[in-house]
Amino acid sequence: MSSDKFKLDTLFDDNDEIIEPDGADVKKRNVAYYYHKDVGHFHYGQLHPMKPQRLVVCNDLVVSYEMPKYMTVVESPKLDAADISVFHTEDYVNFLQTVTPKLGLTMPDDVLRQFNIGEDCPIFAGLWDYCTLYAGGSVEGARRLNHKMNDIVINWPGGLHHAKKSEASGFCYVNDIVLGILELLKYHKRVLYIDIDIHHGDGVQEAFNNSDRVMTVSFHRFGQYFPGSGSIMDKGVGPGKYFAINVPLMAAIRDEPYLKLFESVISGVEENFNPEAIVLQCGSDSLCEDRLGQFALSFNAHARAVKYVKSLGKPLMVLGGGGYTLRNVARCWALETGVILGLRMDDEIPGTSLYSHYFTPRLLRPNLVPKMNDANSAAYLASIEKETLACLRMIRGAPSVQMQNIVGIRLDEIEQIEENERLQKSSKSSIEYEVGKVSEKMEEECFVEEDSKPPSFPPGQDPRRIGQYWGYDRSGLAPPRSHSDVIEEAKYEDRDRRKDLNIPGIP
């Protein structure tokens, strides 16, 4: 990576603007930011590491830094069953649409197994609404890019990359990324998908594994680690051979080697694939100190990867993904919103934030301290880079334009998007500053990330089915099917305290 593009000790450059005080005349960027005040108020269950409340805190930081005035803020629409069935099977969509926690208690085990419902992917109240909200921003965001209404769209609630065509996986139920890419393919011949989540983007690769119109590139922790896929030799099949790029990394990779490899691979992809649009999944579990992650990336490095992709100048959709240390998820995505907008952000979190007292230190980019040695040798990374670039050189000619199962173009898309925005503007509340606030009970649970009190369950209820339990299980280690299959890899800081809770699977 050339030293003139990114310096490891700084993130912002001379082209980035200082955020103007409230009331100042500012220039809006051609960026759309999707958010809905309800999307962060769902609850996977007590002890479950996935906290949608992180979205509320992230949006609070975005508002506190006064970023909405620099972009178009759009209320995420809810998708309907037909929208989601563009990718997912009818049986699975019907299940998601009708299942409730109470109904789940009476369902046969084979039905739950069919859709991979369990500890990782529980049934919780409002499951269908949650899915339609987080996916709505990705699908409509793709439509805005298709019609050149924006250069960049941001949907932090999206990026749930593990969901499969007919089953849930890895905390993900509906694959909003696949739905968004299918929309983009209506107007773009070639779409590039980049994934910097610590977990392999298996659901997206699987969906496009035999396509030469979508290239998937995943930088992920490899080995005995969920989902257990993403070998460097996994390169796609049929027409899609060499269009799946996997960059398997070992634990505790540091900033400089990660960024060097990232730029080398992505520049090679840009040269050989020449995408017309890009989707970037920004899972923040690749940060150092993540509760489930094992990388050692700083906030600067993670954001620098986003900045590099933005610099390619292609229509860009930016999505969230994993991330299980709530404060750092909010910090990361708020920071990257500013990077996308080209803003120079004060490192001190504004006192106007509703959650500023939970950030200790009260900094946007605190120093994260690695607890493991980097397991990625220079020789190993060089071999990964060499093999990846060789794979890219195997691409012959331009990808085909035709692709099976692409739905027809809707002629009324622009009118519908504009109508949605008109209705939003005429409503009494302003989405730009309607932050939302989680309940005090939920707030305490989310920020006190290791619950010191044992969960209480009503007699006779199976907590694994209703989202009140999340633990570990030593079964099924080859290959891992869920996060709970990889007990040695999914670490919590206070293991002994969880052991005292008598959670099954904790020795």
From Swiss-Prot:
Please note every region of biased composition (Basic and acidic residues).
482-501
The GO annotation for biological process reads: chromatin organization; DNA protection; heterochromatin formation; negative regulation of transcription by RNA polymerase II; nematode male tail tip morphogenesis
Q: Enumerate the residue ranges of region (Histone deacetylase).
A: 29-342
GO molecular function per UniProt: histone deacetylase activity; histone deacetylase activity, hydrolytic mechanism; transcription corepressor activity
Alphabetical list of SUPFAM superfamilies matching this protein:
Arginase/deacetylase
Q: Where is the active site?
A: H162
A Gene Ontology term for the protein's cellular component: NuRD complex
Q: Where is this region: Disordered?
A: 444-507
One Pfam family, short name: Hist_deacetyl
Q: Does the keyword Nucleus apply?
A: yes
Gene3D superfamilies per record: Histone deacetylase domain
Reactions performed catalytically: N(6)-acetyl-L-lysyl-[histone] + H2O = L-lysyl-[histone] + acetate
What's the Enzyme Commission number for this chain? 3.5.1.98
Localization per record: Nucleus
**UniProt entry keywords in alphabetical sequence:** Chromatin regulator, Hydrolase, Nucleus, Repressor, Transcription, Transcription regulation
What binding partners and quaternary form does the record give? May be a component of a histone deacetylase complex containing saeg-2, saeg-1 and hda-2.
User: Cross-referenced PANTHER family, in alphabetical order?
Assistant: HISTONE DEACETYLASE 2-RELATED, HISTONE DEACETYLASE HDAC1-RELATED
What does the UniProt record say this protein does?
A: Probably responsible for the deacetylation of lysine residues on the N-terminal part of the core histones (H2A, H2B, H3 and H4). Histone deacetylation gives a tag for epigenetic repression and plays an important role in transcriptional regulation, cell cycle progression and developmental events. Histone deacetylases act via the formation of large multiprotein complexes. As a likely component of a histone deacetylase complex, together with saeg-1 and hda-2, functions downstream of the cAMP-dependent kinase egl-4 to regulate the expression of genes required for egg-laying and forgaging.
In the record, the note on similarity to other proteins reads: Belongs to the histone deacetylase family. HD type 1 subfamily.
- Annotated protein name in UniProt: Putative histone deacetylase 2
Q: To which species is this protein native?
A: Caenorhabditis elegans
Q: Which gene encodes it?
A: hda-2
